[in-house]
Regions:
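Residue-level recognition of well-ordered secondary-structure positions
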Residues: 23, 136, 206-207, 213
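Structured, helix-rich domain cores that form ligand/interaction pockets
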Residues: 1-197, 222-240
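Helix-turn-helix DNA-binding segment
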Residues: 202-210, 241
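Short, solvent-exposed alpha-helical "recognition" segments
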Residues: 210-225
Length: 241
């Protein structure tokens, strides 16, 4: 039974008979505004969690994580709308475009889904040509598989390496059309990839994706975006620590 709902700086507290649930974005709490368009350094995240702990006298070891959303903002070398347009699959799940604003989502299950969107459309006064790639889960099982269980874990810098590695792994699973490269046109045909998924050989899709990226060469757009993410992570990790 739900008893009491309170809010404080973009955090929402719901008191039940047997537990307290806290929902909200730590990034938005830090900004004291409902946006996450700016850079959020790892040290800022840790300091913010400790501040919340102090204000509300929380035992972070008893604050179990059920939902988690993490991502990274980068400025790609092409217009973000063009980048999003050419996002085709994550793993074997197609990217779909809802109507709200310029973003795509792959998967909608509680365990995991990924989102890619144009942050500068969402917050045009705060950033420009900014691409956000994020992972969201509503199951503790996914979070626990990262070795993360409680808010206390998110005050420890080592766990952020696990988080960024998870994010990069999910990006590795993305099929991105790079039409700047002149290769067999079948690779830019969505029907070709659908047929790969329907093939009796269940490995055909992954094998063809590997072949596609090999044909593109090392300087392909997918690889460039990944390297940009890696550089951004190093920047966020090095600042203010």
């Amino acid at each position: 039974k739900e008893l009491v709902i309170k809010s404080y700086k973009n955090l929402y507290f719901t008191k039940y008979q047997d537990r307290l649930e806290i929902k909200g974005s730590i990034h938005c709490y830090f900004n004291d505004e409902p946006h996450n368009a700016n850079d959020f350094y790892i040290s800022d995240c840790i300091d913010t969690i400790i501040e919340i702990k102090t204000i509300f006298n929380l035992d972070l070891n008893k604050c179990y994580l059920i939902n988690l959303e993490y991502g990274i903002n980068i400025k790609p070398n092409i217009p973000v709308p063009e980048l999003i347009l050419n996002l085709i699959y994550h793993e074997k799940r197609p990217f779909n475009r809802p109507r709200k604003f310029d973003y795509k989502i792959a998967g909608n299950e509680a365990y995991k889904h990924v989102k890619a969107y144009d942050k500068s459309v969402q917050f045009p006064n705060l950033c420009n040509n900014t691409f956000r790639f994020e992972v969201k889960t509503k199951q503790a099982k996914f979070i626990n598989n990262l070795g993360i269980y409680t808010l206390q874990n998110l005050t420890e810098k080592t766990h952020y390496e696990t988080i960024i590695n998870s994010l990069l792994k999910e990006w590795d699973n993305v099929l991105l059309f790079d039409k700047s490269k002149k290769i067999d046109s079948k690779y830019y045909n969505p029907q070709f990839w659908e047929e790969c998924l329907m093939a009796k050989n269940r490995n055909k899709f992954n094998n063809q994706k590997k072949s596609y990226y090999t044909k593109l060469g090392n300087d392909n757009l997918h690889t460039i975006i990944k390297k940009t993410m890696e550089r951004k992570h190093k920047y966020l990790k090095s600042m203010h620590i």
